[in-house]
């Protein structure tokens, strides 16, 4: 396990690292949706679900999404003007709420628009979508050109209600269907999770897709070109053909903000974190639901493990007779507009939970291992190579150690390394951490 270190913390970094320490404990946070009854419990890490106003158990799920503008911050101190979907009367957020429903639910989405431009929502993968009770169809101008993929909510107060039956389980996106290249870039998107009839611990109606519901994660992949956003904020027409992303994000954040807990107070409009948190030798795997709303592919790669891809675009990977077509990947390719469901289980194949010398015999005639430990600043390393062990005598004075109980931290990132930057500065962007707790000690309990 390579020790992970960062430069000495600024005041914002101190808040971030303190937030990670909180995320390591068994804390619950509050907030999120405009209606407490409609929102799921907020945890320091993992998926945060928003449920319909009728409550999670109802077979009708009604959501109100309000298109608003606002600002987000980036780890390098930049502030960027955005659009986004708020939960009802809630504040602007980026990305929009994670809408969680059950297979067979009647889903109603009321879109209210406070922006100075028309907007809309499309639901890729959903069939029979209606808008204000009429089959949703593209909107044409007088010359027959498409101006929107679906009926819109007028600017400055317009509204439209979409409805459909969520008949197929899986992971989906919802995005603007109006001037979609610009409006999706501005932030009008979110994730939709349809849970199968077989139960919330399954990704699809197949036993092989079972996962641990306490280790469920959504990673919405987006990019951001400040020039486009500046043009919109200033009332100019953006040149979307000249787009040049400067930031790459997971759940609306770039590293190191990706590892701050859900609802971090210093990221008020970016509520969702991207830390993957599992336990070694799990009885059931974790699931990561990837949602790509960009126009390019992202090869997502966690160090130290492969992911088993079980579904793509809301469809179980199965043959015509139900054959299991899932497969393991070193880097999981998430194409433009695609969603991918992958299972992960970190197995202690090297027996790193046992620090006894007998468990790790020294090979004969090998070069001596020299102590080359040089650390500065803050670290999540335990000081020991063994899972579940800590040795803080390995650290010189002045090191702040955030490790809780000898857990491991692995890097998980886009393997398109230009995307692991914040405005060109390395070790940022579409990157997060994967925390592995000792066997049978999730959250160090």
Where are these regions (language model features)?
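Extracellular/periplasmic metallocenter environments
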Residues: 115-119, 126-130, 137-202, 324-445
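Divalent metal-coordination and catalytic microenvironments
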Residues: 65, 109, 121, 176, ...
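Aromatic-residue-lined binding/catalytic grooves and analogous aromatic/hydrophobic interfacial grooves
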Residues: 296
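N-terminal, post-signal-peptide metal-ligating segments of extracellular/periplasmic oxidoreductases
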Residues: 27-152, 158-161, 233-287, 319-322, ...
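Bacterial N-terminal signal peptides that target proteins for export
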Residues: 4-18
């Amino acid at each position: 396990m390579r020790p992970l270190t960062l430069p000495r913390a600024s005041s914002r970094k101190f808040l971030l690292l303190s937030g990670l320490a909180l995320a390591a404990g068994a804390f619950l946070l509050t907030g999120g949706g405009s209606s407490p009854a409609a929102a799921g419990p907020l945890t320091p890490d993992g998926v945060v679900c928003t449920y319909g106003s009728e409550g999670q158990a109802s077979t009708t799920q009604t959501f109100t999404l309000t298109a608003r503008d606002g600002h987000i911050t980036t780890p390098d101190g930049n502030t960027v003007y955005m659009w986004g979907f708020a939960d009802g009367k809630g504040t602007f957020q980026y990305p929009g709420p994670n809408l969680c429903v059950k297979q067979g639910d009647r889903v109603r989405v009321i879109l209210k628009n406070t922006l100075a431009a028309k907007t809309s929502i499309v639901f890729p993968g959903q069939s029979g979508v209606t808008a204000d009770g009429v089959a949703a169809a593209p909107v044409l101008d007088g010359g027959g050109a498409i101006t929107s993929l679906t009926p819109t909510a007028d600017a400055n107060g317009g509204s439209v209600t979409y409805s459909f039956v969520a008949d197929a389980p899986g992971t989906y996106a919802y995005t603007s269907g109006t001037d979609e290249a610009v409006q999706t870039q501005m932030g009008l998107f979110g994730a939709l999770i349809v849970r199968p009839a077989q139960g919330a611990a399954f990704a699809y109606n197949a036993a092989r897709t079972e996962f641990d519901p306490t280790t469920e994660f959504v990673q919405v992949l987006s990019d951001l070109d400040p020039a486009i956003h500046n043009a919109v904020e200033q009332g100019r027409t953006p040149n979307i053909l000249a787009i040049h992303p400067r930031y790459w994000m997971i759940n609306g954040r770039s590293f190191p903000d990706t590892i701050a807990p859900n609802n971090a107070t210093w990221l008020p409009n970016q509520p969702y974190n991207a830390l993957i948190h599992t336990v070694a030798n799990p009885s059931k795997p974790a699931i990561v639901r990837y949602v790509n709303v960009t126009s390019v592919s992202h090869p997502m790669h966690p160090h130290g493990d492969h992911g088993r891809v079980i579904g793509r675009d809301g469809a179980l990977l199965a043959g015509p007779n139900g054959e299991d077509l899932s497969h393991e990947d070193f880097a999981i390719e998430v194409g433009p507009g695609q969603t991918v469901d992958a299972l992960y289980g970190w197995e202690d194949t090297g027996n790193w939970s046992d620090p006894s010398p007998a468990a790790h015999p020294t090979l004969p005639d090998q070069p001596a291992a020299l102590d080359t430990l040089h650390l500065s600043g803050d670290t999540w390393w335990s000081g020991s190579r063994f899972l579940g062990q800590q040795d803080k005598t390995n650290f010189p004075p002045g090191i702040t150690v955030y490790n809780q109980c000898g857990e491991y931290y692995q890097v998980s990132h886009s393997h398109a390394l230009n995307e692991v930057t914040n405005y060109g500065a390395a070790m940022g962007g579409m990157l997060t951490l994967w925390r592995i707790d000792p066997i049978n000690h999730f959250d160090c309990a």
